[in-house]
Amino acid sequence: MKLLILGGSGFVSGRLAQIATAQGHEVWCVTRGNRPIPEGVHALTCDAHDPAALRAALASAQLQWDAALDCICCDAPSASVDLSVLPAFTNRLLVISTDSVYHPAYKRVPQDETGVYLHDGGYGSSKRQMEEVFLDAAAHSESPFAWTIFRPGHIFGAGSQVGCFPEHSRQPDLIARMKRGEPLRLVGGGKFLIHPIYVDDLCRVLLESIPVSTAFNEIFCIGGPDIVSNAAYYLLLGEILNVPVTIEEIPLAGYLEAHPQFSGHLCHRAYSLEKLRRTGIALPSTPLRAGLQKQVEWLLSLAR
């Protein structure tokens, strides 16, 4: 297939471009050109959130794509750009949202695709407003243009730092700290659940979803095969590094009020994948231990 990726130089978008190319697809990446993109892909340089610039960049390629995959759609305006520009160049769009769209005070375990959403102006709220633009468009249009949205939680793998929870979320010196025997400070002792997904699994599901009609104009929760506490994640990381782990509890009371940016973390993040299962798309299968081992090996290789 001919695939258009909005993004291509980031953690997820770059890996998506690599995997798509390895599968034999021809890939174009839209970036601002400030960072390198994977080898073997075509570069389209513009601000993807500027509709005129995006339209001109896509027109310059003089082709139709089998699908577009937007890894950088972050709010209602960017969703509106997708809907105003992309249908002239493709009939299919995959979008990455976030599990942070849910209001943490009302989440269930496991949480499905319906729920109470944030409207506080933060990251999760902006992503939900993005979703609402697509939902509204689908409800008021008979266009053949079809989208699918996925809500991953913690995405992990080579290309990103380890750590999934405050105060050690994607911390560049986390491995060094652990090797020095420093205690880890986790809010609430890390009692909340997470449902991490290995980056390669997320990319595979995105690509496999392209022709699946039962996924058209639908939103899906997505996560890997393991649901663990945040504390268990760090203990597993210690096992992989062969170092002991001591966890110091940061009181939960008052932390969210002082650090509202972590609202999507200070709750259980465990999801039902039943809706995704019913499409027939193979569910993510990489165990947390296996994916985290690969991530650690990649990070250690950078330090050599």
What are these regions (language model features)?
Residues 63-110, 118-121, 125-136:
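NAD(P)-cofactor binding segment of oxidoreductase domains
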Residues 173-185, 191-227:
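Alpha-helical substrate-binding/gating segment
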Residues 199, 255-282:
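Conserved C-terminal active-site "lid" loop/helix of NAD(P)H-dependent oxidoreductases
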Residues 45-64, 74-80:
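Conserved Rossmann-fold cofactor-binding substructure of NAD(P)-dependent oxidoreductases
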